[in-house]
Structures are given as C-alpha cells and as structure tokens.
C-alpha cells in the first residue's frame, strides 16, 4: 500500500459541504465514489472542511491505494475525473510519505472572497456575493486589523469543537477590478464603479466560518467612518459588529501550503 495526495477543485454549489454526509451528497462522498470505481476503497482525508456552497480552487486530500498505481498517476487522474465530472476536477496526484497528513502538516491556507457590484445575474448567483457598492479604503483598514496573531472567538461558528481559537493571519487585503482596460485611470478619476472586489486571506489556519464572519464584519465596517471607528474599538474588546456570516457562494479555498 502507498499514500497519495490529490489536488483538486470543486464547485461547492453542487454539494452539501466538503465533509462526508449521511445522504452521500458531499464532495468527499463524490470523491470516494469515484475512487471506489477505480478500485481504491479507503476513504479520503482532507486538508480543510468547507461549508455548503463554498468552492475550492486547490483542495488537498489523501488516500491509501495499491502499488499498482505507482508511476501511473496521469492514468489514475484521468480515470477518477471520468467519475467526478463536471463538478470536481483532479488537477494533480502525487505519492507522499505514509506519515503525511493533509490537515496537520499544512503550514498555511489561503482563501479568496469575490464580491460582485454589477446588476444581479442569475448565472453568477452561485459564485459571487452581490453587493452594490463599498469603500475600498475603509474596507482595507478594517481588514488590516485581522493581520497578526489573535483570539478569533468572535469570528467563528460556535460549537465546532476547536481546541484553540487563536490563529495568525499573514495577509488580508482587498483590490478591485474595473470593466475598462485602463483600470488605474478609472480608479483614480472615479470614471466608473468597479465590477468586482476581491478579498484575499492567508493564515496558519482558519476556524469554521471565520473567513465569512471576517468578511461580513469588514463590509459592515466600511459602510461609514462611524462604523469603521466602532469596529476598530470593538475589535480590541472582541465584540463583532455582526454575528451573521457573509454568504458562502463568494468564498473559495485558494491554496493549501506545505
């Protein structure tokens, strides 16, 4: 037997989260089914758990399989993808040590949150958070507060059984995308509103729903100077502006670092 790591993307709108479910409608369930079809019967172990509606650009899972597949990873990838398409796509397979654990060996994870400012579009509804307008300067001031090592008790879903609520955020910043080819000109002279706001986070780990709660609070904070000052004051006292997380459809697990 050997252990392999699968790197893959998935459309989270089609599943009830990533972790296996009793009704077999989770990402891991679909992946396990596909592996069973190619003769691999051990269940996968994943690096991160994502909620219903959350997507992944590069999730990592491990599974044990027979030595038959050693040096046949491209063939294995193609075989698995036949059974996971169109909502899960295996991008890479590699052999790892027997001691490797995709969750506990990860040193960092990054997430992306996409906010769409144009008119509502039913074809984008599963992939972005519709939000009419925001102040990018205030948003980045709010996001900067998250950087560093903090107790994120106010920013996670209670009852998820975490041993520690302390996490270290390495990066938290937003940028905007404009329709015009000359985005810098448009941003400088405010000739049009941005189409998208992209928020990127990187940390040594995240609590359940932490990213969505951080986004929700940052969006509340950027509504006005008063809200921003209140958020800054409340953050020191561990009092969030809201306990309602932002919608899951705009969130993407971007990368797991080892």
UniProtKB/Swiss-Prot annotation:
The keyword Electron transport does not apply. Belongs to the tRNA pseudouridine synthase TruA family. The active site is at 51 (nucleophile). SUPFAM superfamilies: Pseudouridine synthase. This is tRNA pseudouridine synthase A. GO terms for biological process: tRNA pseudouridine synthesis. Homodimer.
């Amino acid at each position: 037997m050997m252990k392999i790591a699968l790197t893959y993307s998935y459309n989270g709108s089609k599943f009830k989260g990533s972790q296996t479910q009793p009704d077999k409608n989770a990402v891991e369930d679909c992946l396990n089914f596909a592996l069973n079809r190619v003769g691999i019967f051990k269940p996968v172990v994943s690096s991160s758990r994502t909620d219903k509606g959350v997507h992944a650009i590069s999730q990592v899972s491990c599974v044990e399989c027979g030595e038959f597949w050693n040096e046949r990873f491209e063939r294995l990838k193609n075989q698995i993808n036949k059974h996971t398409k169109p909502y899960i796509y295996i991008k890479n397979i590699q052999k790892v040590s027997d001691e490797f654990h995709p969750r506990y060996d990860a040193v960092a994870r990054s997430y992306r949150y996409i906010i769409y400012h144009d008119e509502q579009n039913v074809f984008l509804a599963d992939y972005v958070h519709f939000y009419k307008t925001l102040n990018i300067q205030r948003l980045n001031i709010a996001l900067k507060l998250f950087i560093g090592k903090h107790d994120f008790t106010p920013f996670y879903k209670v009852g998820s059984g975490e041993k520690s609520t302390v996490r270290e955020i390495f990066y938290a910043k937003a940028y905007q995308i404009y329709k015009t080819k000359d985005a810098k000109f448009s941003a400088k002279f405010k000739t049009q509103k941005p189409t998208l706001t992209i928020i990127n986070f990187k940390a040594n780990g995240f609590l359940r729903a932490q990213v969505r709660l951080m986004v929700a609070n940052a969006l509340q904070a950027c509504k006005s100077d008063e809200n921003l000052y209140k958020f800054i004051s409340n953050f020191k006292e561990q009092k969030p502006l809201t306990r309602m997380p932002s919608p899951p459809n705009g969130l993407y697990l971007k990368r797991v670092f080892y």
